[in-house]
Amino acid sequence: MNLRPLHDRVIVKRLDQETKTASGLIIPEAAAEKPDQGEILAIGNGKILEDGKVRPLDVKVGDRVLFGKYAGQTVKVDGNEVLVMREEDIMAIVQK
């Protein structure tokens, strides 16, 4: 991928969601909600503060994160859909 996000933006790849329920029912792709978890593919340099200083981001490439259903802007890169969002749209980092 040849995208480098600016400032406090990150590029996230949505993680595949389970298509089968706990009871074994298969959920059709059209009925499944978009996953709200993803993996950070790239990060910007940091948030520019009012005093002009740059605060580094809390997330790093490879982190698994949780975000809101409507967070970010979907873009296609090399035929793959990714999300470009601000770090503030990320709700949590999933601990391994």
UniProtKB/Swiss-Prot annotation:
Gene Ontology terms: cellular component: cytoplasm
Source species, domain of life: Bacteria
Cellular localization per UniProt: Cytoplasm
Keywords on record: Chaperone, Cytoplasm
Keyword Glycoprotein in record: no
Pfam families documented for this protein: Cpn10 (PF00166)
Gene Ontology MF terms: ATP binding; metal ion binding; protein folding chaperone; protein-folding chaperone binding; unfolded protein binding
Predominant localisation class: cytoplasm
GO terms under biological process: chaperone cofactor-dependent protein refolding
SUPFAM superfamilies cross-referenced by the UniProt entry: GroES-like (SSF50129)
Keyword Transcription in annotation: no
InterPro entries documented for this protein: Chaperonin_GroES (IPR020818), Chaperonin_GroES_sf (IPR037124), Chaprnonin_Cpn10_CS (IPR018369), GroES-like_sf (IPR011032)
Subunit architecture: Heptamer of 7 subunits arranged in a ring. Interacts with the chaperonin GroEL.
Family classification: Belongs to the GroES chaperonin family.
Function: Together with the chaperonin GroEL, plays an essential role in assisting protein folding. The GroEL-GroES system forms a nano-cage that allows encapsulation of the non-native substrate proteins and provides a physical environment optimized to promote and accelerate protein folding. GroES binds to the apical surface of the GroEL ring, thereby capping the opening of the GroEL channel.
Protein name: Co-chaperonin GroES
Organism: Janthinobacterium sp. (strain Marseille) (Minibacterium massiliensis)
